[in-house]
Amino acid sequence: MLHSPPEGGRSALHQQLSAPLPEQPELVLVTDLDGTLLCGSLEQRRAFYGWLARERHRVLHVFCTGRDLASIDRLLVQDEALGLRAPHVVIGDVGCTVACGTSLTPLPLAVDPIERRWQGKHEPVAALLAGTQGLSPQPISATRRLAYYYDPDTFDHGLVAEIEQHGVDCLLSDNQYLDVLPAGVNKGSTLVALLELLELPPDRVVTAGDSLNDLAMFETGLAGVMVGNAEAALRAALPRLPRTYLAHGHGCAGIIEGLHHFGFGHLWP
C-alpha cells in the first residue's frame, strides 16, 4: 500500500470529483482498455457499453489502463458512437495517475503519494535510457512515468536491473511496452489505495485485463477476469492466481462471462 488512507478520505475524495459516485454500488468493475474493454465484436461492445451506461447508478466503473489522460480523452470522443461513456474514475499511466472519469482532472488525494515516490527519478533514468538500442519513447504526456516501445529482439534485457537500481520499477508488457514507474506503484497498488480511500468493500470488486501490466491487479487477490485473448506471459501466471478466472470469450464477452462466474450475472440483462 502506498500510504494509510487519511481520516475522512472518502468525503475528501468525493469533493475532488466533478461528478458523484454511486453511494452503495452493487459492483465495482475495474477494466483495462486495450485488449479488454475495447476488444470484441462491434455488437458485443455496443451491448456492453449500453449496459454500463444504464447501470451507472449501481455499477461503479473504473478504467485501469496504461493510457495517459490525453489518450483517454481522445478515446471517449472516438468511441462515443459505440456508446462508450466516461467511467466514474480513471486509473491511468499503469497506476501512476488517478483522475475523475467525467472531467479527467487528477485527484490530488490519490496522486500526491505517487508523485512523492517519483521525485528525483525522471532525469537520471531518462539519461540512462537515452539512445538505447531497441528503445523508442512513447508520445505520452505522463509526468510520473517514463514510457517506451521496445524491440524484444534488440533490447538488452539486462538493462532492466540497472534501471531498477535507481529506485524505480521497470515493467515489460505485451512484448512491446517498457514502463518505468515509481517503486511499488502499479495498477494493483493504486487500485487498492483507491478502494480504501472510497471505503469500498473488496467483495464487490471485479477486475479485468489481458496483458502483463494487468498482473498486479490480479495479484491483489480481488476477483479477476483474464479475458480469453490474454497474452501468453499473463496466462503463464494463472496457476498462482487463485482468484483469477480465465474466460473463453475475448474482450467484452470475456468480462461478461467473468461477471457471471463471480456471481454478478443478475446485473446483466
Where are the language model's segments positioned?
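Active-site phosphate-binding/coordination module
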Residues: 42-137, 229
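Non-catalytic pre-domain segments flanking phosphatase-related domains
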Residues: 1-33, 44, 50, 54, ...
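Conserved acidic, metal-coordinating active-site core of Asp-based
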Residues: 122-220
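Mg2+-dependent phosphoryl-transfer enzymes with acidic/Ser/Thr/Gly-rich catalytic loops
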Residues: 20, 24, 181, 188-269
